[in-house]
Regions:
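Catalytic machinery of carbohydrate-active enzymes
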Residues: 1-379
Length: 379
């Protein structure tokens, strides 16, 4: 009843702009696992290619800011307090910032990961315009969407473009980085690979909350094969919190490779991955960043999670290894179905199809390089 009353009052007080005539769009992004942030990026590109006249503002925080900082497919970022912990502060801040920027959004959208009542209320109370997208409170939205579990998270996010009668084809995520990020990445890689060998990145740690890890002794065999069998330099990436576990694996592998865990921002990580020849990676946030910069990779996926939702299916430079689908996670599960031999075979096949190449690394880096900085002073 309250929601219907609010919408009725809103209908009398707020101007109504049809989707075809929208010029100012505000998107709210506050559910911030790295993979969720990366999987929203195809929407921005799709809408800009279809409707270049629409100005896109994103209100977000944390990883949302990092992922979109250098994107050419949005027009501005607004950093706000977290509405999930302090809705009032977020509403007041967003109102004030929109007022200072002289922005009156024609609509407010939320992506497939941001289905939270407080985020919907931030759109209602903090901004002008009708609301559309994914929500747990469809009565608060004029154009709600239902999540389609038969398609990927990316495909669900692309359905936002359909509100504006845009029909994007399959799109890949993108993460852009600055020239400064690229220089930082080059310096790290010169330190890790002074001889300029082919470079394989190892992502050995998961996000911490899910059963997506692999056995240390199996990683060790793959690492040694990359170094001794393929003649590659090995670099380990991750967060500062991952560093001790990574060092344990590195020592178990005879101190093969160099760890740069905790030494990169998201965009510096993107540059490092773009400048590498291949990745062997768990299904974790770093994998999604690697996909977004088009790095060839072998992905070790969990059998208990629906592959269509998160994994880069039908991407030519990705080899996915996982067990038969299961509904439950066995105790102490560590991707037990994935053998050392299968990972080594997949890595060998990947590097035959996509040979280590200075030119390929340079092309990948160039495609993700951006001169835009939405967080720079005066931006």
């Amino acid at each position: 009843m309250l929601a219907r009353a609010l919408l009725a009052v809103e209908g009398l007080l707020r101007r109504k702009v049809a989707p075809a005539k929208v010029k100012q769009l505000l998107l709210l992004e506050y559910i911030l696992p790295l993979g969720s942030c990366v999987h929203l990026t195809p929407f921005f590109e799709a809408l800009k290619l279809c409707r270049s006249d629409v100005s896109i503002t994103v209100a977000t925080r944390g990883l949302g800011l990092q992922v979109l900082r250098h994107s050419p497919y949005i027009d501005r970022l607004i950093e706000t307090p977290d509405p999930l912990t302090d809705l009032k502060a977020a509403v007041l801040f967003l109102r004030g910032r929109l007022r200072r920027l002289k922005l009156q959004p024609d609509c407010v959208l939320t992506g497939a990961s941001d289905q939270r009542t407080r985020i919907a209320l931030l759109g209602l109370l903090g901004s002008s315009g009708w609301r559309g997208g994914y929500t747990l409170r469809p009565t608060l939205y004029q154009r709600p969407l239902d999540y389609d579990r038969s398609v990927s998270l990316i495909a669900n996010n692309l359905r936002l473009a359909g509100i504006f009668r845009c029909r994007p084809e399959r799109a890949e995520p993108r993460v852009f980085f600055s020239h400064e990020n690229a220089e930082t990445a080059r310096a790290l890689l010169r330190e890790a690979n002074p001889e300029g060998l082919p470079l394989v990145v190892m992502v050995t740690q998961n996000s911490g909350g899910q059963a997506t890890g692999w056995h240390t002794e199996r990683f060790v065999e793959v690492i040694r094969h990359a170094a001794e069998g393929l003649g590659c330099a090995v670099v380990y990436v991750g967060t500062s919190g991952d560093a001790p576990s990574i060092e344990m694996i590195r020592k178990a592998a005879g101190r093969v490779g160099t760890s740069i865990a905790g030494r990169t921002s998201v965009t510096e990580l993107a540059a490092v991955l773009a400048m590498s020849d291949a990745m062997v990676t768990l299904d974790t946030g770093t994998m999604h960043v690697g996909r977004a910069v088009k790095t060839p990779m072998v992905v070790l996926g969990p059998s208990w999670q629906r592959p269509i939702e998160w994994l880069p299916l039908e991407v030519s430079n990705v080899r996915i290894l996982r067990g038969v689908d299961r509904d439950t996670v066995p105790e102490n599960y560590r991707l037990d179905e994935i053998s050392v031999e299968s990972v080594i075979a997949a890595l060998d096949d990947l590097l035959r199809a996509y040979p280590a190449s200075v030119g390929a690394r340079a092309d990948r880096a160039e495609q993700s390089l951006s001169s835009i900085d939405h967080l720079a002073a005066g931006a």
